[in-house]
Amino acid sequence: MQLKKKKFERKVSLTKEARDGILSFCKMNHPNEGILILRGKAKHGDVFIDGLVVPPFSETGADFAGFPNNPLPLDLSYVGIVHSHPVGSAEPSLTDLNNFFGLVSMIVKSPYEDDDIFAWDSDGKEI
């Protein structure tokens, strides 16, 4: 018996508070990258983000941001991550894709305004 994998057309939305928090965090960490865990809910391919978590033991630099995910508590409200790209495009690098966490990865490029937030799936396709 072969199971058919259901394919969702993913959609991402976030509250104004979450958006403002992401942009402020990226601006505060510039010229280094910043990274946050996205908290929210997902249903039928739609991801709704309503909170942010600073990951424990995160490390950032001019061209990297990451955290070990093994010390994270089990929290089903974690739906993905967001990090900044202070220089260059908002497209995910191979390293970004290999460290994908959750359902969505958001990348914010400088100068960190509303139109500078992009969402990606685990295959590197824009959502």
Show where each model-derived region lies.
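Conserved, mostly hydrophobic/aromatic
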Residues: 81
